[in-house]
Amino acid sequence: MQVTTRTMNKSKHIALVAHDNCKQDLLRWVKEFEDKLEDHTLYATGTTGHLLSKETGLKINCMISGPMGGDQQLGALISESKIDMMIFFWDPLNAVPHDPDVKALLRISAVWNVPVATNRASAKFMITSPLLAEEISIEIPDYEAYLAERIG
């Protein structure tokens, strides 16, 4: 697949997602890095976003709840280059009814080269990276070239 580049601004668009058993862990992480997160535009699936906003006061753009389509909404934003990175604390020990949506969200993140942290350690690496406060370019699929190849 051909690639092109897109620029992430200094202020990032960050998605925050957590399975039910991980919501408190994500909340603790958000509180720990609240000072860094407030400089960015935040998105979250519904239940997670409302919990984080209520407990921290951070402005969060809430989708609907993940099992009701919120994972799909975030995936759409990713495919439109409107999400720069995602913090997704998922529960590897318990299956969820909307597992296909979760897999789709992780797949679309990989397709569009969106960095994803899946636990406190990887999230800490991402949020403390000097790149967080820099304008950077990343490679993404060249959709126009992809479409041209498909339709000739």
Curated annotation (Swiss-Prot):
Enzyme type, top EC level: lyase
Protein residues bound to substrate: H19, K23, T45, G46, T47, T48, S65, G66, H98
Residues annotated as the enzyme's active site: D71
Its EC number(s): 4.2.3.3
GO biological process: methylglyoxal biosynthetic process
Keyword Glycosyltransferase: no
Family: Belongs to the methylglyoxal synthase family.
PANTHER family: METHYLGLYOXAL SYNTHASE
Function, in words: Catalyzes the formation of methylglyoxal from dihydroxyacetone phosphate.
Protein name: Methylglyoxal synthase
Record organism: Photobacterium profundum (strain SS9)
Biological classification of the source: Bacteria, Pseudomonadati, Pseudomonadota, Gammaproteobacteria, Vibrionales
